[in-house]
Amino acid sequence: MKHRVLYIYEGKLSYHGIDRVVREQLLALTGGGCLVDLASRGDPGIDGVSFLGRKWTIANLISWLPRSVYYPAQKRVFMRLGARLADKHNYTKIISWRDRALLPFRVASRKGIPCYLSHDSMHWRGTMAETNPLPWPSLSTSEMDEEYRLAKQILLPSENSKDSFLRNGLPEEKLKVIGRGVDTLLFAPATSRTDSKFRIAFCGRVCERKGIRQVLEAWKIASIPNSELLVLGNVDKSLGDFVDANASGNIRWLGFQKDILPFLQECDAQILLSRREGMAKSLLEGASCGLATITTKDSGFPMQDQINGFLVERESTAHIAELMQRLDKNRALCSEIGAAGRNTVLENYSWGAFQKRFLAAVAG
């Protein structure tokens, strides 16, 4: 008899970001012989997955409101749908992403169904949820704690994320690091370059948390001739004036790009100076392309300093500038570090490897 699994996630199941992670988890489940009931806004079209979600919900009526209201409202809708499905059917297990799991996990606890919480970030303590908690419809911190408590396993993107849970008292046996994945055949080094200009990519939301101010400060200090900094990602509204003030020179503000591969393949290195990041998937994609990586511990990148990348403190802009200059002047070193980063991805972070880790984590 095949296992029947309820999977809850309110996204549209595109091929980007967390949507892609969800797709890979669904493929892993069906490939492992499970039948999946999916509560989401998108039908992935995967054999063995029954779409029981809604492409339009009542929360769409408030889609004009700020993200901080609209997205939690959608999560509440699918949390309630998940609870109804959990109450109606006898599932072998329930898998839900954080902030969508509370009500279905309560039902599952009553029925004795094991629950698995997929988490994309850090424990809520030390994040905006603690320092500036959002009102309803966001979950309260006590509700987040209840999700943690009801989960049999919490599936985490990095060791850094796991450490944040351990520091806050969660037992190690509840925490499973499954990492992330990347299409290593697609994200591969370029066979040739159009020119020899030294380029660094910043790929991610352009916001304070990702360290864009520090990146630009280091870039200006480095002042590398014949070079470009490519900034790929949506800009936070609060940084509009900052971007306008830095819109000239050798900084290219490219906005959000559905296809980042052509830009990565024109670069030599990548940089992200994140705080409180679960796992920066864009860094895995850049590393898979053979880019030398400069990042912080908080990015979640599997770093061996000066072997497969460079680990830095985000405020050490003078040191970061020196690294940029060093990689420009020593292209052989840049290529060597980039190749080591790609090997790390090939060995541990293909989507196939990710699927195996995920299946092992939810096997109990």
Task: Please give the residue ranges for each predicted region.
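Membrane-proximal helix-turn-helix segments that form the acceptor-binding/catalytic region
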Residues: 80-87, 102-103, 123, 134-154
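Carbohydrate-associated surface elements
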Residues: 160, 181
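Short hydrophobic beta-strand element within catalytic cores of glycosyltransferases
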Residues: 292-295
